[in-house]
Amino acid sequence: MADPDWTLPAPEVEAIVSGRHGDPFAALGLHQSGNDWVVRAFVPGAEELEVLDKDGKRLVWLPRRHQAGFFEGSLPLSNRQTLGYLARNAGGSWTVTDPYLF
């Protein structure tokens, strides 16, 4: 099965997790792709990442694409909105505000 059109190419994911991406704002955060809303996040140390709306409501789990903590997935949204994340690993959980939401 082919990746969706909005999937970030593997070399770009590698560039993000290694700190070499020339324009992380173009890749990370919430983006519209056709009729889909896509979110990408790099949360080092996270093994799981859940997207939260501005009120803290849990929206969806994001698939982890890179073990360093890169996550990407589509969201059931009708418009742009403020998002946060609930990150988890074996040591516990923590919340993250998406710094790329502008």
Residue ranges and their predicted role:
Residues M1-D36, K57-V60, R65-F102:
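The feature marks proteins involved in alpha-glucan
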Residues W37-A41:
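Short, well-ordered beta-strand segments enriched in hydrophobic/aromatic residues
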Residues F42-E48:
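Short proline/glycine-enriched turn/loop motifs at strand-loop junctions of beta-rich domains
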